[in-house]
């Protein structure tokens, strides 16, 4: 379970607030949210290992995992803008499963090894039931709302400011029922051949070549049903004539029959604030029965399908060659290169006159849109290990890696919301992010002192993906023709994803120390202490577009045109990468002992490393 307290603010105009040098924002709403979740996880595995002759073996792995989640989400919102109290509860059943099968073999012959494998993975995520009901209480505030909007957020709901004690004043406002199914199937096959060579102690190693094919098929199907239940309460009374009615207005459905009598009061946010709490909850079984009886009242909402559904596939073909060359006992050189080719094809929906929210029961024109893209990269890697002393080694590495776009951004959609003048546009033309990585690591080991490692790293990343919102303007990068849109949409807003033209860099220093206290007496003997400290500095050019207006030259009052022209103001600012820390510290304490000849370790550690160093042999 978890709980959140959220306050929303708003600010308009540029007139400074009295006594301040700026326009002070005001509260529009405060929200209490409590999420309860019950999880059941099941796992099963079946593995086989066959030896079919000298130097040959075949292995089979089968793994099934299932997860069911029963979710209960409660939210209470103090809506200052509209002067009402809103209580929303969502009851959901989410199920997921993964089935993985893999067959692989290794065969030794002629001082070489041939490895092969085939695999299949089937991942399914479905929400067969998600029911949401919203109750409202009108005019619960007992003081001037304007005065509440400037208070500290947790004081808005103080008993002297709002009267919510009579829950019979709640009335049923609306209901939503959602289902969703997402599937992802992956098929893969790979083949590797490794040939060792040995020219004595001065020069030995191996050469390895291989290839891989991977196919991914994805699909998401959603269904949303919604209805205003205050306006359509007579339909509910036809199905449930004895259901209780609201004391606020006898025409509306009340809350009394939905109350959970077994609800147990729990402190909200550990009683951090006196005025924040949930005093009741809806009964989940009653909510399910309500939908089962009144499912004919709910109406399908097409907007959700247009904005979320997709299908598609990706085909990845890769090949590589690498080698490990040991020059004496002091130098190990590991060069390699990988060729990566990806072809993708996705389908989604595009619509015109799409409603601006998912509560309007409107029909509109839409079509299925398909788009494809392909890209290929050569990804080199070089590793060098130098060991001048038995207890000292130096490691250098250069690698290039890819990070592919989120497939939800690749689904080709053109959503035109004419009522608010907005367009949402997605296509498969996004490039993967390419990272060039440099690492240098020095390690020193002494049995009496322990292991000391210091490393430096530098990363340069291009093709970061960001979302831009701008006006559609002719003769600019957001010319409607560039998106296949009609010129009549000039002046409308558009939101689309694109690759950033600015690179990001990350550089840092990492120090790691591990030592064992061998000379301490008793249980403390052999205690292992470790510490890791990372200092990082990152820099990214962020591209921001501000939608603005300028006065139209030669404007004539009454000529039927608008007095202002829309413009896009582009700004680039540099800052550290989002969610990228500048300092990390990890500590580890281990107490290895031996019980009956079995080594037992009880580590206690904190901190999570945010960086993965290049793998060095």
PLM regions: where:
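Gram-negative outer-membrane beta-barrel transporters
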Residues: 458-460, 477-610
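Short loop/turn motifs that connect adjacent beta-strands in outer-membrane beta-barrel proteins
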Residues: 54-55, 110-113, 149-154, 197-207, ...
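Transmembrane beta-barrel wall of Gram-negative outer-membrane proteins
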Residues: 1-73, 93-103, 110
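Transmembrane beta-strands of outer-membrane beta-barrel pores
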Residues: 2-4, 64-68, 109, 120-124, ...
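Flexible glycine-rich, low-complexity coil/linker segments exposed to the extracellular/periplasmic environment
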Residues: 3-5, 10-27, 143-174, 225, ...
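Signature of Gram-negative outer-membrane beta-barrel scaffolds
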Residues: 31-36, 67-69, 174-176, 192, ...
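Outer-membrane beta-barrel signature, preferentially recognizing the C-terminal barrel domain
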Residues: 87-104, 308-315, 373, 402-461, ...
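Transmembrane beta-strands of outer-membrane beta-barrel proteins
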Residues: 1, 58-60, 112-118, 205-211, ...
């Amino acid at each position: 379970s978890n709980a959140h307290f959220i306050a929303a603010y708003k600010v308009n105009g540029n007139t400074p607030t009295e006594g301040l040098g700026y326009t002070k924002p005001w509260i529009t709403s405060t929200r209490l949210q409590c999420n309860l979740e019950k999880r059941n996880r099941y796992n099963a595995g079946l593995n086989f290992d066959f030896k079919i002759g000298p130097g040959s073996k075949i292995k089979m792995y089968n793994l099934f995992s299932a997860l069911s989640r029963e979710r209960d989400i409660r939210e209470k919102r103090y809506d200052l803008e509209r002067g009402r109290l809103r209580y929303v509860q969502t009851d959901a059943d989410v199920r997921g499963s993964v089935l993985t099968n893999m067959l692989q073999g290794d065969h030794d012959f002629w001082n070489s090894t041939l490895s092969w494998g085939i695999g299949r993975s089937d991942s399914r995520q479905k929400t067969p039931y998600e029911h949401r009901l919203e109750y409202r209480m009108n005019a619960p505030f007992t003081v001037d709302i304007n005065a509440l909007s400037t208070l500290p957020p947790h004081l808005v709901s103080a008993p002297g400011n709002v009267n919510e004690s009579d829950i019979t004043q709640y009335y049923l406002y609306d209901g939503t029922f959602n289902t969703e199914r997402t599937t992802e199937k992956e098929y893969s096959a790979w083949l590797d051949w490794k040939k060792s060579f040995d020219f004595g102690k001065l020069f030995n190693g191996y050469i390895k070549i291989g290839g891989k094919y991977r196919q991914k098929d994805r699909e998401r199907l959603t269904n949303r049903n919604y209805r205003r239940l205050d306006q359509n309460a007579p339909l509910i009374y036809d199905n449930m004539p004895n259901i209780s009615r609201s004391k606020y207005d006898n025409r509306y459905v009340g809350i009394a029959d939905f109350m959970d009598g077994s609800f147990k009061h729990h402190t909200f946010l550990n009683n951090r604030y006196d005025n924040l709490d949930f005093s009741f909850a809806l009964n989940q079984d009653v909510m399910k029965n309500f939908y089962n009886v009144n499912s004919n009242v709910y109406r399908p909402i097409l907007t959700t399908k247009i904005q979320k559904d997709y299908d598609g596939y990706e085909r990845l073909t890769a090949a590589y060659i690498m080698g490990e060359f040991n020059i004496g006992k002091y130098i190990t050189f590991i060069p390699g290169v990988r060729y990566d080719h990806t072809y993708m094809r996705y389908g989604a929906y595009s619509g015109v006159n799409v409603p601006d929210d998912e509560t309007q029961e409107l029909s509109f024109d839409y079509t299925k849109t398909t788009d494809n893209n392909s890209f290929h990269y050569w990804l080199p890697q070089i590793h060098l290990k130098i060991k001048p002393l038995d207890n000292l080694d130096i490691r250098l590495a250069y690698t290039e890696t890819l990070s592919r776009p989120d497939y939800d951004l690749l689904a080709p959609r053109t959503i035109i919301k004419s009522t608010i003048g907005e367009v949402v546009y997605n296509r498969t033309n996004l490039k993967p992010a390419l990272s060039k990585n440099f690492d240098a690591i020095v390690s020193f080991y002494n049995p009496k002192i322990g292991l000391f490692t210091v490393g430096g790293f530098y990363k340069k990343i291009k093709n970061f993906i960001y979302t831009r919102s701008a006006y559609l303007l002719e003769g600019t990068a957001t010319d409607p023709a560039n998106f296949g849109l009609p010129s009549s949409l000039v002046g409308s807003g558009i939101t689309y994803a694109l690759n950033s033209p600015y690179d990001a860099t990350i550089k840092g220093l990492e120090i790691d120390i591990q030592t064992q206290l061998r000379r301490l007496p008793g249980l403390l003997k052999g205690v292992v202490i470790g510490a890791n400290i990372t200092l990082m500095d990152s820099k990214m050019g962020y591209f921001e577009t501000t939608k603005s207006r300028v006065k139209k030259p030669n404007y004539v009052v009454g000529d039927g045109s608008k007095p202002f022209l829309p413009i896009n103001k582009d700004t680039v600012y540099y800052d550290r990468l989002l969610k990228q820390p500048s300092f990390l510290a990890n500590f580890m304490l281990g107490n290895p002992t031996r019980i009956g000849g079995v080594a037992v370790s009880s580590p206690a550690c904190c901190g999570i490393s945010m960086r993965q160093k290049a793998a060095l042999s």
